[in-house]
Regions:
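Glycine-rich nucleophile elbow surrounding the catalytic serine of serine-hydrolase chemistry
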Residues: 13-23
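Short beta-strand/loop motif that positions the catalytic acidic residue
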Residues: 147-149
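Short, proline-enriched alpha-helix->beta-strand connector loops that line the catalytic pocket
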Residues: 139-145
Length: 172
């Protein structure tokens, strides 16, 4: 804004980026002119259970380790859309097997790399902060927000999570 004061400042957040964008606008929303959220979600399934397990691992000194059970608790629900055998671990992300294969074999794609227990706890804390009417109350009322998702997007809970977020904003 300092370098280009006459240009509008937009944020586009997709999937996990939409969570970060929501967290950002709750604090700095007056600094942006518009937000587009693509594939965001409302109430995150199994959040409390995942947070508890992450905190237990951290308390045991295992914060920098990775427990696949944490990923299963927090993200396993996204695989419900998968009707075929799970080969790569990213099948939830797209119904096109070629896209799934290419992403799984892309050395720059980090979606399949292990995440530490501490990172998952930070993720859970962010999700907790952007969930519900208390989050929506922090977002500037006049900030235009475009909220979109596909009806086959598991992160957006097949459109239902996006509707929840929209409702929180409308109610605030």
């Amino acid at each position: 804004k300092e370098k280009y004061p006459n240009l509008p400042y937009f944020i586009l957040g997709h999937s996990m980026g939409s969570f970060i964008a929501r967290d950002y606008v709750a604090t700095y929303g007056s600094e942006v002119d518009c937000v587009a959220l693509c594939g965001t979600t409302g109430i995150f399934p199994n959040l409390a259970e995942g947070m508890k397990l992450c905190q237990e691992h951290i308390d045991e000194g295992k914060g920098d380790e990775s427990d696949p059970n944490v990923a299963q608790i927090l993200l396993g629900w996204m695989f419900q859309r998968c009707t075929e055998e799970i080969k790569y671990g990213n099948e939830w992300s797209c119904s096109d097997p070629i896209v799934v294969y290419n992403a799984a074999n892309d050395p720059l794609c980090s979606i399949l790399r292990p995440t530490t227990n501490r990172s998952y706890l930070y993720f859970c804390q962010m999700i907790e902060a952007i969930t519900g009417p208390s989050w929506a109350e922090k977002v500037p009322k006049k900030l235009p927000i475009y909220n979109v998702a596909g009806d086959e997007d598991p992160v957006g809970q097949y459109g239902e999570g996006v509707k929840q977020v929209t409702q929180w904003l409308e109610d605030s």
